[in-house]
Every structure is written in C-alpha cells, then in structure tokens.
Amino acid sequence: MSTSRPSQSSSNSGRSRHSTRIIAQTSVDANVQADFEESGNSFDYSSSVRVTSDVSGDQQPRSDKVTTAYLHHIQKGKLIQPFGCLLALDDKTFKVIAYSENAPEMLTMVSHAVPSMGDYPVLGIGTDVRTIFTAPSASALLKALGFGEVTLLNPILVHCKTSGKPFYAIVHRVTGSLIIDFEPVKPYEGPVTAAGALQSYKLAAKAITRLQSLPSGSMARLCDTMVQEVFELTGYDRVMAYKFHDDDHGEVISEVAKPGLQPYLGLHYPATDIPQAARFLFMKNKVRMIVDCRAKHLKVLQDEKLQFDLTLCGSTLRAPHSCHLQYMENMNSIASLVMAVVVNEGDEENEGPALQQQKRKRLWGLVVCHNSSPRFVPFPLRYACEFLAQVFAIHVNKELELENQIIEKNILRTQTLLCDMLMRDAPLGIVSRSPNIMDLVKSDGAALLYKKKIWRLGLTPNDFQLLDIASWLSEYHMDSTGLSTDSLYDAGYPGAIALGDEVCGMAAVRITNNDMIFWFRSHTASEIRWGGAKHEHGQKDDARKMHPRSSFKAFLEVVKTRSLPWKDYEMDAIHSLQLILRNTFKDTDATEINRKSIQTTLGDLKIEGRQELESVTSEMVRLIETATVPILAVDLDGLINGWNTKIAELTGLPVDKAIGKHLLTLVEDSSVEVVRKMLFLALQGQEEQNVQFEIKTHGSHIEVGSISLVVNACASRDLRENVVGVFFVAQDITGQKMVMDKFTRLEGDYKAIVQNPNPLIPPIFGSDEFGWCSEWNPAMAKLTGWSREEVIDKMLLGEVFGVHKSCCRLKNQEAFVNLGIVLNNAMCGQDPEKASFGFLARNGMYVECLLCVNKILDKDGAVTGFFCFLQLPSHELQQALNIQRLCEQTALKRLRALGYIKRQIQNPLSGIIFSRRLLERTELGVEQKELLRTSGLCQKQISKVLDESDIDKIIDGFIDLEMDEFTLHEVLMVSISQVMLKIKGKGIQIVNETPEEAMSETLYGDSLRLQQVLADFLLISVSYAPSGGQLTISTDVTKNQLGKSVHLVHLEFRITYAGGGIPESLLNEMFGSEEDASEEGFSLLISRKLVKLMNGDVRYMREAGKSSFIITVELAAAHKSRTT
C-alpha cells in the first residue's frame, strides 16, 4: 500500500492508514470466508490468500453485500459449543426469551440422587428462571442480575432444583436482554463460592508474582516467561505468544511445547489467518476457549416475537466458525485457549494533571494454547488467565514505552547527523561522506538526484531506472512533496517487476522541483526465517490446506514484492532533512548553502540549552527549599547544613537556629542509636532507606510532642565522588503512627478508631473476603465525596474503584489491574505493602496518595478481609519511595541468587577435589599426573573466585596477593585449558609461541590471579575471533637485577587473532569509562584491576587486520637452591 505523506502529524497519519488497512483487510477476510463456504472440500487456501492479497482497499472483487453478510454471520451466529448451555432473559421480567437446544436436558433433568419435591420445572420460552434453580441459587442469581456491572460477579455458583447439580452462571448484558452461560462444575473441581477477581487471582498468584519481578528491557524474556507460566498453569500441549506486525500479519515470537511436537517458533502468517472481525471480538472478550473442534454445535432457539436478533459475541460458549475449525484440525489442534494482549496505542498522548482521558487500545497480540485432545478449563481458571494476560499486557506496554524512548534517542541522534551533514559540502556531503543519508534511516540503498546527476549508495536501481522513477513521481504524484511505500508494485510503478527483489520499498522526497533524495528497501521475505522444524526428505505439505506451513508459504508469497514498512519516526527524520535542504535551496541555480545561518541556528540552540539547564537547576533548588516533605542535610561531622521550610514548620525550629547543631541533639533519646548508625553508614557511602525515628519539637510545638519521620538517607558527593555529607528526604508519619498505636492498644474497639471523625485519623476503607466493601470511615468519605452508605456492600473492585461506571474512577486499566494485585496480595496472606494509588473524587479532583494494605485475621489466623490506609504525601515522594523499593527488592533478589549459586557450587566442587585426591594416590602416568595438576589448579581458581566477598576491594586495589613459587608453563597450560572447548567448537587453531626457556622460568607471585587474568583475556579473544581462524599467544620475558640476589621479571603476554576485534564499547567498559558495564565488560575491568595489582597494565591494539591484547606484569624470579 503506497502512501503519499502530506504535512501532518505522525500519529494522525498512522492512525488513518491503519483504519484504511483494517477496512480493506475486512473485505479480504470476507472474500476468503465466502470462497471457503462456496468451495467446500475443494477450497485452495494458498491461492485464495494470494489472490485476495493483490486486491487493494479501493478495489473490492465482490460487492459490499459479501462483507456485510460476513460481519452479520460473525456477530449474529446462533450456535454454541456443547460443553455448557445458554439462556437469554428479558432484562426486566427475567423470563426466558432464548435457550440452547441442550438447556432443558442440562438444567431440568431429574436426578435420582435428589428427592422429588413435586412437579418438575419445564424450560421453554417464557419460563421464569427462578423456577429452575434452588431458592438460594435463585436469590443469588436475581441479586446479581440487578447489579449494574454484572460481569464483576462472575462466576455465580447455582444449583439446579431437579438434579442438584452445580453450575457456574456467567452473565453479561446485551441490548434488551441478559445472556447467561451455564458451565457444569466438574466433580474433581472445588467450586468457587466467592465472585470476581479476588478469588480467581489466587490461581495465578505465582505467575503474576514472577512477571512482576522481571527486570525491564527484554521483550523476549517477558514473552518467554509468560508462555512458560501459562503452560504450567493450564496444562495445554503447546503455548505460543503471537505478535501482530504493523501490516497486520502475525508471528510466533515465543513458544513452549511438550516433547515430540514440531515447533512453530518464528512462523509468520498472513493477516487473513486471524480476521479483523475476530480481532475485534478479542478486544471485547479477552479470553476465548474451544473445548473440542470436532464436537457438534448446538442451536440457540429464540422467541419468534423478538424484534431483534440476539448477539452471542460475549458468550463463553459461542461456537467457532467452520473455516477456523478446519484450520485447527489440520494442525492437529483439537482444543484451544486464547488470551488477548491489549495495549495502549503507541501514538496517543495522555496529557492533563488530573485524570487523563482513556487511551486508545489496540490488539498487540495473543497468547495461544493448543491441545491435541479435547480440553476443558473451568471458568475460574480462565478468569485467572485473563487477569494474568492483563498484567502481561501492562508489562508489554512498558517495554513498548521503553522502545519508544530508545526511538526518541535515535531521533535526537538523527538530528545531530542532519546538522553534521549540512555543516559539510551539502547536498553532496550527505552521500559522499560518512555519516551519510543511509545512516539516517534503516535502508538497503539510497540515492541523490541533484542537477541531473545521480549519486548512489548500496542497493539501488540503475541510473536509467532512477530517472524513470523520478519521471513517474513527477507525472503521478506531482502534487505531493514525496512518497513512501513498502511496495512500488502496489503503488502502481510500471517498472516495479523489472527492479526485482532488491528494490521493493521506497521513500522519496523532493528538495526542489528537479532534485530528489531516495531511500530503498529490499523485500520482506529476505528477512523472514521460520524457526520451526523442517521436513524430512520426501515429505510435502498440501498447500491447499489451511495449516501453519501453508500459512507461512502464503505469507512469503504475499511479501515477495513488499519491504518492511517505513516507520513514522523514520519519515519524520526524512522530512526534517527535506525541510532543511529545501529552505537552503530557494534558488539552486545561483546560491550555495548558507553555512553561517546554520551555525547561528546551532549556536542559538546551544544557548537555549544552557539557559534551560540553568533554569532547571534553579528550579530544583527552589523545589527542595519549598518542598512539601521534610528535607535536611548534615556535613561530615554530623552538623546541620540544610533545613528546609517543611522541617522547620514541623519541629518549630527555624533554619537559622538549626544550622550548625549536631543532628543527634535534635532527635529523641530513643532514636539516637538508630540515627547514629544511619549517619555512620551514610558517611561510608551505604545509604539506608525507610528508617523511622522521632525528632524533637521546639517552642510552641513542644506541647504537640515529637514528630515521627520515615527517612531515606542519601550521601552527598563532590566531583571526585568523595562523600562530603548526607541529606535526608523524610515523610511525616506522625498521624499514621498515632492511629496504628491506638489500633494496637485497642484491637477490641477497632470501629471506635476507624469511625472516629478526628482529623488525625487517615482515610481508611476495607473489604471482606468476598470483595465487598465493608469499611469506609469519615476521613475517606470526606476525601472522596462518597458517603459510607453509598459504598458499603458494593464490590470494591469495579463498583467502588474502577475504570468506567464506578464511584471513584481510576486513571486507566493498568491502575485497576495494579490495585487488584495489591489487594489480592493481602488476601493471599502476604505482609503489608505500600503502593502508589490515585483516583478521581466525586468533585472531579484527582487524588494521589500512598495505599497501605493490611490483612484482617480471625482468631484461627485465617484471612477474612483487609483494610487500607491512605497517606497523602507529595507526588515526588511517592515516586521516589516506589523506585527505591523496587531497586531494593531487585538488589536483594540478585544478592540472594548469588549467595545461593555460590553455596550450591561448593558441594560438587568438594566432591571433585575429593575424587582428584583419590586419583593422586593411584599409579598414574606422566600425562595423567599433568592432567590432574591442571584440574587441581582450575579447582583452586574456582574456590578463589567463590571466596570473593567484596568486589570493591579488587576495584579499589585493596586485596592481598597470595605469593608462591610457580612455573610459567603451568600457568599458561591451565589458562589455555579453560578455553579449549570453545576453541574446538569454533574450529580455531591456537598457537603457543612462548620460548621453551621462558616456559620453564620459575617465578614468585600470585599464580592463581595470573591464571585467572590470562584465562579471561583468552576467553574474550576466542569469543570475538572468527571461526576457523588462528589465535596466537606469545610471551616475552625480561629480567632486571635488583641487588645481588633479587631479580625482577617483566612479563609481556600478547594474545593475537585476526579480525576487527572486540567492540569499542566493551573496551570502554574494561577501562572503567562506562557506568553500566555488561557482564563481559565488568569481568574485563576486574581482570585489568588484578593486572595493575601485579604492577602491570593491559593494552589493546588493532593493526593490519589483526587485534591483540597486550598484558604486562612484574614478578620476582624465584630463588633456585643449588645442591653441592
């Protein structure tokens, strides 16, 4: 699809193109479905997809009636799956207006196990639903049916009057009626008696906790974790994560499958495989289950008097369509469970200080479960999967936001490139020098047409073809300033086929009427690889059948003449270059580029940037001084040198009197030791968080009593990173502490505290174990504007706090899910936790606070509900506390994992050492003894590394070397042995050019450290050396005599290999110039520090196609005793 881009925002143009594509794709979906219905068994899937893909959005091969009939068929289908039954009720009388064929048998069948109580109920049109179920069930059902957000109560446990059998009733509203799906409760299944997400969450608690604990920055790791957790939670044979690309085609990006199943990882499939109508339904119903694709579907019988058709789109029992069923059967998938992953539109801006408008949503992808035999998943577990998918979607959204931030950085980089290009010989410099226009956006080729001459880079059409494209653009796109397309063939360029696969997509912009810049991309299929299993020799797929392999084949056929689409941010960069060049070429025949104006512009930008930085700095100082949270600071001696307005107000001690006093004289006696320890650690660089202590009050504030603070200590450092003081960011928790103290003393009179109108009582609300609001104190009523009577006995999640029709509206779905996680953690018995929380009060004001959730226990220790305290600190403090808590948790988990690994390695290592010692007592040959010696030295090296408890000592040069005699031969041989497996794996030949006399040299020093260093640099060299090449290690030994008996040995090790060598960024990490070093870079940094402890250093040299590490150390020559 070609796009001529006028001057408009990227978001609007992108959304417009997406809407156009959806409309066109829906027509294509309708035609594929029509072909299938008409052709029956002779339906040729691959050719159908291929033909429909050639139809653009403006040209429909069939009438609109086909599309209309298709959408009606999707939305108004009257068939259900037989694993349950369905009733439709009039929403006013609760009488049956439609029912499935199997409903009478399932709901009114007599069971001999239940005593007969008279006439059996008859189920039909007009039946009162209350006559079918037991009295308690009918009462519960009617109560739910009168509920506004009825879906929040699903599932509702009911029992049939005649058989006594239990069913889950799953209710949803449609226009004019209520649809109820009834699913039998299996005998092995413990029925869920409570409604809503609170109970279902417990089923997915482990999976949610694992997702929540993942570090950000890796979409692949997130997807792999999600499919693994769903695989374990649901028990399906195969679980996959599907991602929809910008052109609506899909890809399997993660997969877990039982042994013996062929993998589908890496598979791509056309957009028609999951029609747009189905995607729309996934946006409405986040979880979809097919129990048995071979089962016979049942009809829904509707009251003939109804003036409208019922829609079953929201039904859990809705039958899949025949085309999809055949696809499933062809891939040997009899049952499936699909979860929608819905994220925010990437181009939406959410602005406004209070409650932001709801973001537009899009279907990012699906989590799909397949089973080779029929499989039924109870509704509570499906509900848990839906909740898990929402948590997953939040994390996907965060990863996408992180990617967008990277894109924004790339845009800034392109702006720098633009300026760099224009500071030189523009416009020729943008193609003749480096960086050039191919560095601006990802492309396979680029060209400049300037003054009837052509400059080409990479894969491009030839000069004649480029002039032909320019002529075609002038003729057919003369009104536009350029064109971007992922298919010149689809855009209508007559010579597209002659260009072949190398040139499919193009972005072109005009500089002047006659001058243009082009970027070209090759076809998408060249970048697509299916990671699935390949065929055995002689096996073939029937391309006519709907199957993943034929989908993949069809997809490759579709994209043969199509490139990767041009991203909006890429086109923004291209248009930026176009606008700058056009402004400098107002008269191309008589003028050159005005460099001075560009330099002036750049200079103005720098001045603005400096002024903005100074303004930000001043604003930060002002914010600290006027912050609504207490902030204080001390110098190295513990004397106050910072005391902001808020701390002065709380304590009654003005700034001028506080400055110069020792911090310990200002705190209560009971807190002196706590503060002394915190201060001592902070001055050592160890910053403590969330430390609670009491500080004295002065003057008129003495009567109030001491102030309770929770403090985060931060070390102040100078330019050389030396600690010069400590500043403390505090939170006043005096009011909360008073309440908690009272609560502790008066547990038996809980209501007297909570309902006390005293302004010191913070806002408190609570819930029982079933999720109904059971507490709402006066402070909460005042804060929200909703009285106790208006919220008690409403569903806390959904009715009281929710996204749509609720008392206190939350910001978005992400906030709703996060609140559910926090509350459910308390219901699961976890310790109290605090979380950022925000909602819209009745008066329209957005309230931001900290939520503290505490579980309520009965006398037996069982959780019977929870209550929540709200704290209302500043927004800055909320964010700071949250970030600190997450960092602390991550650091603690990593520390525990490291401790676990170190501990678990010790046992097998001890076993290896013991086995080696046993072997040493046996009769061994010379070579065998040498191997044992090498093994022993490797084991000692492992033990040495495992015993490291403080890496900072190595970095700071404060460790002691363990000196002993050794030969250079044994150190080199042990070091080389540690990389031999990798060397053989890459087919590298290693050559040791160390002279024999040097090998036999006896030295005095820390052999294990030298061995560790050499092995590390050998490993990194092997990693970046080309396969099949050669790696050489040579040693130069130089002796210097110090006195009569001491010789100083200078060793130079040179590790050389062919190729460009290791990346520059890794070298920077080795020399300590990068703050966030990778694992490789940190290891090299430690090795270099160890070398410097041995009076040496490390250099890296690139020369004549070779790269070398040069490691120098100074050791003493060992004294050789002579016998006479």
Curated annotation (Swiss-Prot):
GO terms for molecular function: phosphorelay sensor kinase activity; photoreceptor activity; protein homodimerization activity. It comes from Cucurbita pepo. The lineage of its organism: Eukaryota, Viridiplantae, Streptophyta, Embryophyta, Tracheophyta. Residues 616-686, 749-820 form the PAS domain. Residues 1-24, 39-64 are annotated as: Disordered. Residues 900-1119 form the Histidine kinase domain. Homodimer. InterPro entries: GAF, GAF-like_dom_sf, HATPase_C_sf, His_kinase_dom, HisK_dim/P_dom, PAS, PAS-like_dom_sf, PAS_2. Signal peptide: none annotated. Belongs to the phytochrome family. This is Phytochrome A.
